[in-house]
Regions:
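A general structural signal for short secondary-structure boundary/capping elements
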Residues: 21-26, 92-94, 115-120
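A structural motif corresponding to the C-terminal end of an alpha-helix
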Residues: 36-39, 80-86, 121-125
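Juxtamembrane helix-loop transition sites at the ends of transmembrane segments
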Residues: 45, 94, 111-113
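Gly/Ser/Thr-rich active-site loops/lids in small-molecule metabolic enzymes
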Residues: 1-5, 66, 70, 111-115
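A C-terminal functional module that forms or caps the active site or interfaces directly
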Residues: 50-99
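Mid-sequence, gly/pro-rich, charge-dense loop/helix-turn segments that line enzyme active sites
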Residues: 1-65
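His/Asp/Glu-rich mid-to-C-terminal helical/loop segments that flank catalytic regions of hydrolases
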Residues: 98-128
Length: 128
């Protein structure tokens, strides 16, 4: 929750507890043992309903959550799949740094190409 320019985690309010299912210590964890065999780098992500556009916001999120990346829909996928006991995997390709508003510096084409490459490798590994 954002209030007066500061971010307050929902767990610091009376809305929910950080260990209420499907949360584990405030995180939506994918503990699927089948994922351990995949040779993919892991990242800690936070999901926001906005685009972070300042260095102050970026630092607040890094300090509060030690997050590697920011998404706008990742938590919804995790939440629903955990609630419904549906196996899932979220693969991300990074196009820009948090807070970078100059879209000419974003590398969307390269990010999509890298994602497609990794998906082809993953599909090949899973089907062979």
């Amino acid at each position: 929750m954002e209030e007066k320019g500061n971010y307050t985690p929902i767990f610091n309010t009376a809305f929910t507890d950080k260990n209420e299912f499907p949360f584990t210590d405030g995180w939506l964890m994918n503990a699927d043992e089948n994922l351990k065999c995949l040779d993919l780098p892991k990242a800690k992500a936070i999901t926001l309903n906005k685009v972070s556009d300042s260095e102050l916001q970026k630092q607040q999120f890094v300090q509060s959550f030690n997050a590697d990346i920011e998404t706008m829909e990742g938590a919804a996928l995790h939440y629903v799949c955990l609630q419904e006991h549906i196996p899932f995997l979220q693969i991300r390709s990074i196009s820009n740094h948090v807070g970078e508003r100059d879209k000419t510096k974003w590398k969307i084409k390269e990010a999509i190409e890298n994602l497609n490459k990794e998906l082809q490798i993953l599909i090949n590994d899973l089907t062979n």
